């Protein structure tokens, strides 16, 4: 309860500071919070904000699923096969430092300006986070569990799907949901070209027309969605770990 109260104070303080800044600055640069809220209500009433969220959500979802579908098997391969680890580990280690936005013009040249380009960009943005995260999750697995499995007659493959995958599931799920939130932060880039719907499209169109209040509104919606994903990630991970602990106690 105290934590919730402190967060409410922080939220109100941010809104108050924003309000003071808007009163002492040109609204072209710092819009009034009331105008931003009114814009949000208009888009809620006409349903445009839900259409934008739907299109953005689907783009991020497709990219995130592809990222996970590649990152998890590759992570298991790198963790369990020495040759793959020697070859791929140096590449994976530098992934987190890649300038993701630098790929945008290249992807336009390679795939054009349709949905393939947008999803490819979001795939890169999410994959460079997911791939190292999967390896970190696997490295947290207790090696004694794997050794015990091998001792009682499990094959290497059995230790993967009976020990490693269940042990890393909460952490990987947490990484996946966080990756989803990260994908939303890149929408303002990938939806600026040839997009008719989406939160990034709202930002691009509003910016071109000098409607800073709409830009702020779309950014706030993206931030709120990311916060929701972070909360879902925390709750899901907590429940999975609690279930795993109970299962271990039963065993």
Which residues does each predicted region cover?
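Periplasmic/extracellular loop-to-transmembrane helix junction in inner-membrane transport proteins
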Residues: 24-65
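Transmembrane alpha-helices
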Residues: 120, 124, 156-189, 222, ...
């Amino acid at each position: 309860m105290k934590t919730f109260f402190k967060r409410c104070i922080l939220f109100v303080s941010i809104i108050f500071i924003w309000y003071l800044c808007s009163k002492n600055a040109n609204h072209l640069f710092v819009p009034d919070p009331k105008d931003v809220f009114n814009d949000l209500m208009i888009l809620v009433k006409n349903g445009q904000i839900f259409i934008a969220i739907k299109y953005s959500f689907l783009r991020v979802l497709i990219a995130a699923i592809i990222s996970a579908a590649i990152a998890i098997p590759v992570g298991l391969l790198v963790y369990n096969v020495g040759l793959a680890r020697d070859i791929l580990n140096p590449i994976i280690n530098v992934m987190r430092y890649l300038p993701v936005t630098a790929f945008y013009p290249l992807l336009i040249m390679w795939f054009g300006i349709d949905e393939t380009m947008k999803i490819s960009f979001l795939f890169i943005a999410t994959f460079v986070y997911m791939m190292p995260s999967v390896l970190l999750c696997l490295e947290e697995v207790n090696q004694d569990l794997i050794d015990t499995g091998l001792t009682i007659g499990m094959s290497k493959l059995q230790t993967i799907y009976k020990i490693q995958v269940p042990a890393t599931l909460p952490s990987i799920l947490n990484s996946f949901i966080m990756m989803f939130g990260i994908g939303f932060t890149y929408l303002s880039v990938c939806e600026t070209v040839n997009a008719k719907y989406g939160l990034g499209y709202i930002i691009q169109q509003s910016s071109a027309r000098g409607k800073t209040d709409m830009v702020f509104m779309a950014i706030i919606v993206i931030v709120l969605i990311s916060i929701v994903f972070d909360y879902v990630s925390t709750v899901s991970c907590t429940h999975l770990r609690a279930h795993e602990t109970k299962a271990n106690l039963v065993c």
